[in-house]
Amino acid sequence: MSRYRGPRVKIIRRLGALPGLTNKTPQLKSNLINQSTSNKKISQYRIRLEEKQKLRFHYGITERQLLNYVRIARKAKGSTGEVLLQLLEMRLDNVIFRLGMTPTIPGARQLVNHRHILVNDYIVDIPSYRCKPQDFITIKNQRKSESIINKNINFYQKYKIPNHLTYNSLEKKGLVNQILDRESIGLKVNELLVVEYYSRQA
């Protein structure tokens, strides 16, 4: 299944706020809640499905990518759900978004694809690149690259940067301080239901 490229407002009306997809936050339709509880068996599946869809649309990944992340998380030490969120949060496109360099993750992905971003002074054009502690993220020293970032950074820096990241506005440099904890996740989601969804699909 490919990435979603349709109307974003339609998605957040159904799933709730997804800041990585869009910064718009329309009101949820109240009748959706009543519909979701009309049948207990269907509603339980739907709840797990919607939690999974939140991750897909927020992080802008395909179904296959998300399944691969779940498989990696299962093999790692610790809580599968928490490891899954850490893997998604440490993607380069998401780190750029959380630093306030772009308004959305699709915007961050475009910067990476167009080779505007450097990690540890090397151009990285793979949005799924997994960042690690002590990685520093900068922009290519070109007028076009800097103008794109500056246009966003002045507005989105008013939002709080999570504790596992630091942004130096003078040097225009982002730093990954550490692996983030659960409280720093920028999305309201029940990751355990996502893990359960995939365990039931196997």
UniProtKB/Swiss-Prot annotation:
The keyword Chloroplast applies. Its main location: plastid. It holds the Pfam family Ribosomal_S4. GO terms for molecular function: rRNA binding; structural constituent of ribosome. One of its GO terms (cellular component) is chloroplast. Part of the 30S ribosomal subunit. Contacts protein S5. The interaction surface between S4 and S5 is involved in control of translational fidelity. Belongs to the universal ribosomal protein uS4 family. HAMAP family: Ribosomal_uS4_B (MF_01306_B). This is Small ribosomal subunit protein uS4c.
